Amino acid sequence: MSFCDDREGQRALRILQARLIRSPDACSFALTAVSSLLRKYSIDPRRIGRLEVGTESLVDKSKSIKSFVMQLFEESGNFDIEGVDTVNACYGGTNALFNAVNWVESSAWDGRDAIVVASDISLYGKGNARPTGGAGCVAMLVGPDAPIAFEPGRRGSYMAHTYDFYKPDFTTEYPYINGKHSIECYIQAVEACYRAYTKRERRATERLEEERPDHQAGYETPLDRFDYLCFHSPTNKLVSKSYARLLYVDYLENPANPIFAEVPDSIREVEYRASLTDKSIEKTFMGLAQERFARCVQPSTEIPNMCGNMYSASVYGSLCSLLCNVNSETLLGKRITIFSYGSGLASSMFSLKVRGSTKQMAEKLDVHRRLVDRVVVSPEDVRERAYLKKCFKPKGGAGPIPADVYSLAEVDELFRRVYTVKS
């Protein structure tokens, strides 16, 4: 926070972020997360047939982060592992996940499992975006008969050409960002994905010869068919606005619904483009959504709120938060809807169904203890001056490295990166 010119309390309050983190690079994150997944779940490395990484934190314009992670499979002799890196801002992890699921469902599947990794570090220059920076990595095992399953037919996407956030300058990690436009793009995307999801869901339920889609029966409003939601989280405030936007879409579809009785008729007359930034719409529906948000979304906000924007890992950090904040018995049979967004832009909304116990996942994740155990250091202690440098060995200053965590040990004279693990 002290990197920012604004007073810490003011900025933290306005964007609703609590704590931020810094760490070496996306490769060390991925190595740590995948090795942890293999170790904690006693997974035989030979059982993995696909590994794909979603990231925008590239350390090399040619060599993939996935290729660095292959070090973990050398001892087992398993070099027959498909997949590389997927890049599109914060959306790469979701595209990697879709690819893994498609692989398991395809004729190319050989019976083994897949691992999906979302690993990123977000960095910004001076300005309003800097306090939202963060870092994180999530590794996921994908295979048949999982306790959390994709729901067929419940997915919608929205893709467009925008310049809301991009990184054309390869001499710096800082993006070019139009904050106001980026928020508009995000809100536009969440609405478009919701509409596309609903349209595809309707077709899927019609194919099953159901009388009508379940989003029209048994709920106060269609949004209630989502038991829980996890959003890509640049800031917690944007997540709140986005959930409210979904309720606004429900209102437009059925303004006569009694839950919208207090909504002024004039709101229906606001033109679409203007509605994306209309403060009266935002305020009205954030107020209406408050109770639902606390029940359906708030349990998923802990990690993004405490770790800042983790780019491709952000929405899956939200999923981890949900698994650790809602017990397995409560989650069983529930629908978890995910909204993933990456600037430029690519976005999708899809649903998962909890059909088995999530208790072991929560225990292995151990989110609450790990967040509390973090070491607070000053920005000066983690400020790195090694970007684009060779013949470099990182020096201490950011606290001790925990056991089983990988870190960058050296960049040699040919820019080859060496990682070591703390035993």
Curated annotation (Swiss-Prot):
PROSITE patterns: HMG_COA_SYNTHASE. CDD domains: init_cond_enzymes. It is an enzyme of class 2 (transferase). InterPro entries: HMG_CoA_synt_AS (IPR000590), HMG_CoA_synt_C_dom (IPR013746), HMG_CoA_synth_N (IPR013528), HMG_CoA_synthase_euk (IPR010122), Thiolase-like (IPR016039). Pathway: Mycotoxin biosynthesis. GO terms for molecular function: hydroxymethylglutaryl-CoA synthase activity. Keywords: Transferase. The keyword Transferase applies. GO terms for biological process: acetyl-CoA metabolic process; ergosterol biosynthetic process; farnesyl diphosphate biosynthetic process, mevalonate pathway. Its EC number is 2.3.3.-. Hydroxymethylglutaryl-CoA synthase-like protein; part of the gene clusters that mediate the biosynthesis of the host-selective toxins (HSTs) AK-toxins responsible for Japanese pear black spot disease by the Japanese pear pathotype. AK-toxins are esters of 9,10-epoxy 8-hydroxy 9-methyldecatrienoic acid (EDA). On cellular level, AK-toxins affect plasma membrane of susceptible cells and cause a sudden increase in loss of K(+) after a few minutes of toxin treatment. Gene clusters encoding host-selective toxins (HSTs) are localized on conditionally dispensable chromosomes (CDCs), also called supernumerary chromosomes, where they are present in multiple copies. The CDCs are not essential for saprophytic growth but controls host-selective pathogenicity. Belongs to the thiolase-like superfamily. HMG-CoA synthase family. This is Hydroxymethylglutaryl-CoA synthase-like protein AKT4-1.
